[in-house]
Design a protein with these regions (language model features):
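Conserved active-site "lid/cap" helical segment
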Residues: 1-87, 96, 159-171
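Short beta-strand segments
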Residues: 7-8, 109-115
Length: 171
């Protein structure tokens, strides 16, 4: 197995980005990561792009996100692959990128991800998020993601306000 390194990181600015589409937002973060790695001008060395996204098809009515990102960033002929694994899509995409390099499939891969949920109402967004739970085990028994969030503090001795970054011990 070959050694693998993450050579750049990037993200969008924080705040309301509803003036941009999903691929724009992923492009901003990806360009930021490539710039951090000093590879923006040499981006054609990227052989495969792994895109983490769980809601593009439902929320944004766009399923060809990975190939759209490759085109938007002028990365052709890089292979494009969408990785959807619910709330674990990001870590799954990173695992795929790691494996592609480690096994020798590619020498250079880019992993990116993003969600754009401001295009729907709060109720539609909430309904979408509820689909992330296991339909036969969690959702049918009334478990919700906020309910899981309430379990966290007592189990790990954390203050509830720490999750929002507003209380003692927040960064």
């Amino acid at each position: 197995m070959r050694k693998v390194a993450i050579v750049g990181i990037g993200h969008t600015v924080f705040g309301n980005l509803s003036d941009f589409d999903l691929v724009d937002i992923m492009s901003f973060a990806s360009a930021n990561a490539l710039d951090d790695a000093d590879l923006l001008k040499e981006r054609k060395i990227i052989e495969q792009v792994f895109v983490a996204n769980m809601g593009g098809g439902i929320i944004n009515h766009q399923t060809g996100i990975a190939s759209a990102l490759v085109s938007r960033m002028d990365l052709e002929p890089a292979m494009a692959e969408l990785v959807e694994n619910g709330p674990a899509s990001g870590s799954s995409a990173l695992k795929c990128g790691f494996a592609a390099i480690a096994c020798g499939l590619v020498d250079v891969a880019m992993v990116t991800g993003g969600e754009l949920m401001r295009t729907v109402t709060g109720w539609k967004g909430t309904d979408f998020v509820s689909t992330l739970l296991h339909p036969e085990v969690e959702y049918n028994y009334g478990l919700t993601l906020p309910a899981f969030g309430h379990v966290y503090p007592p189990l790990y001795g954390a203050l509830r306000v720490n999750r929002a970054g507003t209380g003692p011990g927040s960064c």
